Amino acid sequence: MVELFILMMERVGLIILLAFLLVNVPYFKRVLLSREKMSSKVQLILIFGLFAIISNFTGIEIAKNQIVPNNLLTYLSSNASIANTRTLVIGVSGLVGGPIVGSAVGLIAGFHRVIQGGGHSFFYVPASLIVGLIAGFLGSRMAKQTVFPSAGFSAIVGACMEMIQMIFIFFFSGDLSDGATLVRFIALPMILLNSVGTFIFMSILTTTLKQEEQAKAVQTHDVLELAAETLPYFREGLNKNSSKKVAEIIKHYTKVSAISMTNSHQILAHVGAGSDHHIPELEVITELSREVLRTGRMTIAHAKEEVGCSDPNCPLQAAIVIPLFSHQQIVGTLKMYFTDPAQLTHVEEQLAEGLGTIFSSQIELGEAEVQSKLLKEAEIKSLQAQVNPHFFFNAINTISALMRKDSEKARKLLLQLSKYFRGNLQGAVQTTIPVSQELEQVKAYLSLEQARFPNRYQVTFDVEEAVASEKVPPYAIQVLVENTIKHAFGSRKENNQVRVVVKAKQHKLHVDVYDNGQGIPEERRLLLGKTTVTSEKGTGTALENLSRRMANLYGSEGCFLIENLETGGSHVHLEIPMEQEELDARINR
C-alpha cells in the first residue's frame, strides 16, 4: 500500500501540471475565465478529456493485489485493474466547468477505460458519468456567482467522488470478495490522494487568479491616479512644458528606466536614463520613433539594435513606443524605455497601450478647450469647460472607491466614463447638442452616483421620441439632475424620486426636472440662477452657469425657472426655442 501511495503521488503531479497550464498559458486562461460560454465548455471538455485519457495510460496496473511494473498501459489482461487519477480529473473538470463538462469528460474517460480492457470494466462508464455529473452540479452553483469552489470544499468533493468509484468497484468487479479485496488494497491511497490532488489543483487556480485580480485592481487604481494628475497638463496642449511634467508623473508611477515624449518631429521631453543625448527640442533621433510616426501603430523593441539610437553608449536596451492621436491624426509619441530588456513584460505592454488611449483622449480634450477659447462664443465655451473637470474628478473618486471592493464593476464604470468623455469631446466645441446625446451623459452620471449610493435615488425619464434630435445646451439637463441629486433630499436615504420630462410645446422644447425632496428656502430660490449662493453644500455656480448660457444663446426667447411644488419638492423648468429646420421637420411628420 505504501508503494502504491508513492506511485500515485507521482501521477497527481500530472494534475498539478494541468492547473499550471490553465492559469499561466493565456489561451487556456481565457477559456477558463469564460467557462459559461458553450464554446469554452467544448474546449474544456477536450482539455480535461485528454488529461483523463493520459491518466488512464499512466495508471498503475494491479493484478492479484500486486503492483505490475509498466510504463504505459495500452491494454490490460482480464484479471488486472488500474489505480489512477482518472476520477480526480473528472471531478475537477466538473467543479470547474459544470455538469456538461463533467459528464462529457466522465464519458470520455469511462469509455477509454473500457477500451483498455481488464476484468468487468464496463461499470467504469456509469461510474465516471455519475462522478462528473455530481461534481458538475456542485461546481455550477459557484459558476453562477463567477467564482471557483474553495480548495477545502473541493477536497471534500474529491474524496466523495473517489468513494463513489470504490462503491462501484466493490459491487461490480466480479465476485464481492474480489471487489472487497481490491478496494482494501487501493481505497485509502486513492481516496486520500484524490482529495489532496483536488485541494492542490483548486488552490493553484483560486490563489493565482485572486492574486492577479488584486494586482489588476492596484494597477488600475494607479492608472486612474496617474490620469487625474496628467489631465491638467494635457489641457495645456502637447508642448515642452506639459510633456516634461507628464513624463515625470509617468516615471513616478511606473518602473520604467526613462520616459520620452515627442510631437510629430522633435523631442519634447525626456526623463531618466539617456537624458544626456535624448535632449528636448532636438529632432526625433531613433528609427523606432520615426516608424511609429509613419505607421501609427504601437511598436516594441526588445534589443538595443531595435531601439535604433545613434549614440553607441546609450543605456536604453528596450522600448515601447505608443502613438498619440488627436482627432484620428498622429500628433506625437509616448516612449517607455528600459535599461534591462527583462523589465519589458506583457504587463508593461498593456499599461503602455492603455496610457496611450487615455492620453490621446486628454490631448483631444485639451485641444478642444484651446480651440474653444478662439471661437466667437468665448464666454459660452469657457462656461461649458467648467463642467468637465468637476464631473471628471467626482467620477475618478467614485471609481477609486469601488476599485478594491468590486474591480469588475469599477471596470464597467470606467468604460461608462470613457464613453461620456468621448461624447463631451464633441460637445466641447458645440454650443448645442442633440437631446439624445445629452441624456446619454445624464445616464452616465447617474450610473456613477448609483454606484456610490445604491438604491438611494429613483430617476425616471419621460421623453418624447420625436424630440431626440432637438438641440439643447451641453450639460443643461445634467446640471439640473446633478443639482437635484446633491441638494434636494438632504440626508434622506430612501424614497428619493426624480422625474425628467422632455417634450415639445408651441414651437419650444420644454425640459422639466421634478423631485419629491424638501424644497428650497424662498430667499435662496429667488437667488438661484442669478448669482452665487453661499451654503454648506454648494454655491449655486452650476445653475448660474446654465442660466448665463441660456441667456447668451436664446435671449428673451429662452426660459429658466425654479419653483417649489405645493405637494413638496421642487421643479426646475427650461424652455428652449426649436430651430426653424426642426420645426419644419415636425410639421411634415
From Swiss-Prot:
<feature type="transmembrane region" description="Helical">
    <location>
        <begin position="89"/>
        <end position="111"/>
    </location>
</feature>
<comment type="function">
    <text>Member of the two-component regulatory system LytS/LytT that probably regulates genes involved in cell wall metabolism.</text>
</comment>
<keyword id="KW-0418">Kinase</keyword>
<dbReference type="GO" id="GO:0000155">
    <property type="term" value="F:phosphorelay sensor kinase activity"/>
</dbReference>
<keyword id="KW-1003">Cell membrane</keyword>
<dbReference type="InterPro" id="IPR036890">
    <property type="entry name" value="HATPase_C_sf"/>
</dbReference>
<keyword id="KW-0808">Transferase</keyword>
<keyword id="KW-0472">Membrane</keyword>
<keyword id="KW-0902">Two-component regulatory system</keyword>
<dbReference type="Pfam" id="PF02518">
    <property type="entry name" value="HATPase_c"/>
</dbReference>
<keyword id="KW-0597">Phosphoprotein</keyword>
<protein>
    <recommendedName>
        <fullName>Sensor protein LytS</fullName>
        <ecNumber>2.7.13.3</ecNumber>
    </recommendedName>
</protein>
<keyword id="KW-0547">Nucleotide-binding</keyword>
<dbReference type="GO" id="GO:0005886">
    <property type="term" value="C:plasma membrane"/>
</dbReference>
<feature type="modified residue" description="Phosphohistidine; by autocatalysis">
    <location>
        <position position="390"/>
    </location>
</feature>
<feature type="domain" description="GAF">
    <location>
        <begin position="238"/>
        <end position="363"/>
    </location>
</feature>
<feature type="transmembrane region" description="Helical">
    <location>
        <begin position="118"/>
        <end position="140"/>
    </location>
</feature>
<feature type="transmembrane region" description="Helical">
    <location>
        <begin position="4"/>
        <end position="23"/>
    </location>
</feature>
<dbReference type="InterPro" id="IPR010559">
    <property type="entry name" value="Sig_transdc_His_kin_internal"/>
</dbReference>
<dbReference type="InterPro" id="IPR003018">
    <property type="entry name" value="GAF"/>
</dbReference>
<keyword id="KW-1133">Transmembrane helix</keyword>
<dbReference type="InterPro" id="IPR050640">
    <property type="entry name" value="Bact_2-comp_sensor_kinase"/>
</dbReference>
<dbReference type="Pfam" id="PF06580">
    <property type="entry name" value="His_kinase"/>
</dbReference>
<dbReference type="InterPro" id="IPR029016">
    <property type="entry name" value="GAF-like_dom_sf"/>
</dbReference>
<dbReference type="GO" id="GO:0005524">
    <property type="term" value="F:ATP binding"/>
</dbReference>
<feature type="transmembrane region" description="Helical">
    <location>
        <begin position="150"/>
        <end position="172"/>
    </location>
</feature>
<keyword id="KW-0067">ATP-binding</keyword>
<feature type="transmembrane region" description="Helical">
    <location>
        <begin position="44"/>
        <end position="63"/>
    </location>
</feature>
<dbReference type="InterPro" id="IPR011620">
    <property type="entry name" value="Sig_transdc_His_kinase_LytS_TM"/>
</dbReference>
<dbReference type="GO" id="GO:0071555">
    <property type="term" value="P:cell wall organization"/>
</dbReference>
<keyword id="KW-0812">Transmembrane</keyword>
<dbReference type="Pfam" id="PF07694">
    <property type="entry name" value="5TM-5TMR_LYT"/>
</dbReference>
<feature type="transmembrane region" description="Helical">
    <location>
        <begin position="185"/>
        <end position="207"/>
    </location>
</feature>
<feature type="domain" description="Histidine kinase">
    <location>
        <begin position="363"/>
        <end position="580"/>
    </location>
</feature>
